[in-house]
Amino acid sequence: MKKQYPLVAIVAAVCASVTLGAHAALVDSRDKPFNEYSWVTTHNSYEKINQNLKEMPAQLKDGVRGFMIDIYPDTNAVRPELAIKVCHKKLACYGAFSSQLKNEFIPFLKANPSEVVTIFLETYVSRDQLQQVFSTLPDLASLSFNPANFPAARWPTLREMAAKNNRLIFLTDKSEIAGDYMVQGKPITVLFDQDWLVQNDWSTLGLMATNVEKAHNWSCPTRWSDLPLKTELVDPSTQKQWKRLFLMNQFHHGTSTTMDSAKYDNNMTYLQRRQDNCGVVPNFVGVNNYASGEVDRYVSGLNNGGIYLYEGNGATKKEDIVCVIPVKAGVVNRKANGCENDEARSMSLSGISKGTRITLYDNPAGDKQDDHLIVDVLRDVRINEHLILPSFEQDRSEPAYRAVFNRNNGLNGKVSRIEIGKTPQGFADASIAFYEGNNASQNLDCVVPFNSHHNFKMKSNSFGCSNDEIRSAKIIKAKAGSMFTLTGHPEGRHNEGRTDVEILRDITAPLVIPSFDHRYENLDVRVTNHTRHIDGKISFGYIRGEK
């Protein structure tokens, strides 16, 4: 039976749904070591022309937590706090470094006591000049991150960093600048980047922005030849056993455009492609035009896990990523979350807890008379794991998940709605899917709950079941002792044919009843047709479901 959905019903369902926001929360947990987080990081952060015309305070508000800043001496400074200015190759300058610290970063950190910010300094100043500036900013000392304040075995968690108020990390590209700067008896610590992290070469993407995909180079050579990207630990001189951080550079170092950034540089597929070529999960993702494209969703997926949708079957790395959806309970409208409509054909799961249920629908209102897939996660899926569901049109029973597909005319490339929730306990979600063809083929007619006792007429019911259409069923889930009876008579009398189906043991994986015109028994069910054939003639149902 071809289902028609009135436009008003579709619009109402979408508007009423609890749509997850496009900009997800930065992190769901603050109890992982710092090296297990990823952060949006802006290249030449002070140049708003390359950052969607947004100054650094706006970037902070939008969730940016890494900032690349170039600092130069100001030979015309008349006061110590003006000794250093922020410039791009001395061609364009953007004011005093102290002003940005005092008026932008310090107020943000004071107002947000759980947040951590990292500043990457491209340094053209001396220690004395930096000391002059720091000495005018005593508040920095109370915010500065100092590794000496934490045990040697691992990076502190975000919560531990917040508890000690060590929430502003300074990294410099010059070893002679690194060290402690004493201000009123307290240190401001600047770390030498090559001791603590690795980077890919920032120049591979090319000098100029371009709308030609082949002009982009997604390879991932290391920036420093003596530090392979897979270098595991920080430098021994740090006296720490901490994991090295990774800054993944993904920007054109000459010009950038919002169009190129959105289509290529900050596109989910190409961010993932760079990561795959690097072979390391980034802690910092350095980009231009951070608000164009999907870098925020990409980073959210790395931090919090998510549902990754792919354009092709198999969810393989060669396929384009449609989008990543954060795992938040509710209804996800794909378009509102950056997903192209009717594109996805497979998915992978990361960082998802046991007991999560994900349901994908063809119908935007979630009508179960059309194609839908129910996925129950059976074990915790790690944040760095990609658990693949290769197609939306298969029943699958795996150690990590169970997928039940109720077919109408196909779901691949047609997903319009996703619901995220919890797997019901026991047999609370027991159900039967009825089909218009034998062997659970042709159109899906309706899905009926099998967890209670109820009767219904086929042409007048709340499930959408049709009169004189049903020929087979798929028992999705059922408790032993449940049964149902179908009759050819519209009032449920037995004189126009009847078939009883008894559940002999718990059914937790889909079981097909290929026809209601036969009599048979196996370990799972007893099917009894009483004399007259009823396939395609069913008009009434008695449901006796147990839970």
Kindly give the residue locations of the regions a language model identified.
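Bacterial N-terminal signal peptides that target proteins for export
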Residues: 1-9
